[in-house]
């Protein structure tokens, strides 16, 4: 049985490349913002292009924040891309204005302190040895397009047996978070769908990790 994946359709630019890349990775893909598709797919992909505050507003307009939250609370796989990663943190600061994020992870999205922004092009990453997403592509380069990033990570593991998230880093002016793997909740700052063979392998790693049980109901 093929894993079912919904790419969240909320007006975030051209997502067709993500749909095609996920199909090549072996998923049955639906582009939708309908609750049935978002909640019941084996995996949900949250793309994001543009300003933090704008993306948050667009997600709210289709009730996506609640649906993403339900999936996370239910332990259902989610992969967020680019600004999709950023909105999972506590806040985003753009042009002096702070916008609350979903708060799944601690941290603030801020302008990268680099001479040239946006950070546009290929860059290497430093993935942890136990990374599922980067299995087979730890030494590869990925494609980034962003001006903002999370430059600090301070995750408090409150439960003794809780496994801390696997955090992957890259650098442009300063170190920033390139990816996070937190159980069923994963996110990348780069665009795997635009990252050639390395991105294709990463997406296949994620699709292969899905339960592939069809459209299960979320309680």
Swiss-Prot record:
It comes from the Bacteria. SUPFAM superfamilies: Class I glutamine amidotransferase-like. GO terms for cellular component: cytoplasm. InterPro entries: Class_I_gatase-like, GATASE, Imidazole-glycPsynth_HisH. It comes from Renibacterium salmoninarum (strain ATCC 33209 / DSM 20767 / JCM 11484 / NBRC 15589 / NCIMB 2235). PANTHER family: IMIDAZOLE GLYCEROL PHOSPHATE SYNTHASE SUBUNIT HISH. It is found in: Cytoplasm. Residues 4-216 form the Glutamine amidotransferase type-1 domain. It catalyses: 5-[(5-phospho-1-deoxy-D-ribulos-1-ylimino)methylamino]-1-(5-phospho-beta-D-ribosyl)imidazole-4-carboxamide + L-glutamine = D-erythro-1-(imidazol-4-yl)glycerol 3-phosphate + 5-amino-1-(5-phospho-beta-D-ribosyl)imidazole-4-carboxamide + L-glutamate + H(+); L-glutamine + H2O = L-glutamate + NH4(+). Keywords: Amino-acid biosynthesis, Cytoplasm, Glutamine amidotransferase, Histidine biosynthesis, Hydrolase, Lyase. IGPS catalyzes the conversion of PRFAR and glutamine to IGP, AICAR and glutamate. The HisH subunit catalyzes the hydrolysis of glutamine to glutamate and ammonia as part of the synthesis of IGP and AICAR. The resulting ammonia molecule is channeled to the active site of HisF. The gene is hisH. This is Imidazole glycerol phosphate synthase subunit HisH. The active site is at 82 (nucleophile), 191, 193. Pathway: Amino-acid biosynthesis; L-histidine biosynthesis; L-histidine from 5-phospho-alpha-D-ribose 1-diphosphate: step 5/9.
